[in-house]
């Protein structure tokens, strides 16, 4: 079977569904007889996955590798940033921690060129064994202040010679502005690499959006390749976004209520996935004393900054 061009799923913002769509295409390409592999140059997430060599990568790439039917490897996510505080992250390179850096040093420091080379070399190693490579971007592709230091979105798409598909989330509103704005803020070179749009998380009757689809194509100058319905309980880990969905959880009378204390530097909340998928349980994250008092069970999760979170519990009275 002939080879395919590499493909990147970039986003109008964070949590628009890039990880899930990339996983879906890994499985589609696999079923079509190709040998795909996922790749994300740089990830920022508290949660990591241990490879067979006991090295760390982002959990999304581990899920995507499973969808592709291959073992996960650090080349799929060579740079992983694990937040330690509001301003500092642990830098994991090729699966191994190499130290902590504050945001300014990371984005402005001399080491950025070194990390860029490492990311490109990891991609090249992966591409030597798999085709196509299914790349995932990070956040928005339109962060103008970070463009010259970006190593995960359009610069990586150029290195991979990947066709870029822009993913937008219609469920959060503002789909026209987010898609059009993202396209218009691209340089001519970058804009030319974007070949189509996927509209994600659509609710309702698709036929009612036919006119909107045509408007987007006219405004953006590229085809809308598909509209993906809003999917419930798909069970695919999406980095840290699952917590944001449960930050405003509530007590349920017909279920066992499990309250997870929402620490400032909570780590590995995927530890609670086994509880979360049980229909008899209601898992939610909170710092509300009244909700904690009414819960059937309280869990204090792991922390990336134990002392700071212990002080937080004492200062807020949650330790009582």
At which residue positions do the language-model features occur?
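Flexible phosphate-sensing "switch/lid" loops adjacent to ATP/NTP-binding sites
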Residues: 1-319
């Amino acid at each position: 079977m002939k080879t395919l061009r590499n493909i990147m799923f970039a986003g109008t913002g964070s949590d628009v569904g890039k990880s899930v769509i990339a996983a879906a295409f890994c499985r589609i390409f696999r079923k079509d007889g190709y040998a795909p592999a996922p790749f994300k140059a740089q990830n920022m997430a508290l949660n990591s996955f241990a490879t067979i060599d006991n090295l760390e990568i982002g959990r999304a790439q581990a899920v995507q590798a499973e969808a592709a039917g291959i073992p996960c490897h650090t080349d799929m996510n060579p740079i992983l940033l694990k937040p330690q505080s509001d301003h500092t992250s642990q830098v994991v390179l090729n699966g191994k921690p190499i130290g902590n850096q504050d945001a300014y040093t990371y984005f402005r420091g001399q080491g950025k060129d070194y990390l860029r080379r490492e990311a490109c070399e990891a991609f090249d190693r992966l591409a030597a064994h798999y085709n196509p490579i299914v790349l995932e971007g990070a956040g928005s592709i339109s962060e103008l202040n970070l463009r010259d230091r970006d190593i995960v979105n359009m610069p990586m798409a150029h290195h991979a010679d990947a066709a870029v598909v822009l993913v937008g989330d219609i469920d959060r509103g503002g789909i026209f502005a987010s898609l059009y704005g993202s396209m218009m803020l691209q340089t001519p070179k970058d804009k030319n690499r974007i070949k189509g749009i996927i509209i994600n998380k659509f609710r309702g009757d698709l036929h009612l959006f036919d006119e909107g689809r045509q408007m987007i194509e006219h405004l953006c100058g590229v085809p809308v390749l598909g509209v993906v319905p809003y999917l419930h309980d798909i069970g695919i880990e999406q980095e840290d976004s699952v917590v944001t969905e449960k930050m405003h959880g509530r007590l349920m009378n017909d279920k066992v209520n499990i309250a997870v204390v929402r620490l400032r530097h909570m780590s590995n909340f995927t530890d609670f996935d086994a509880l979360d998928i049980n229909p008899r349980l209601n898992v939610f994250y909170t710092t509300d004393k009244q909700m904690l008092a009414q819960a059937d069970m309280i869990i204090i999760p792991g922390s990336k900054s134990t002392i700071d979170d212990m002080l937080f519990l004492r200062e807020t009275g949650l330790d009582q």
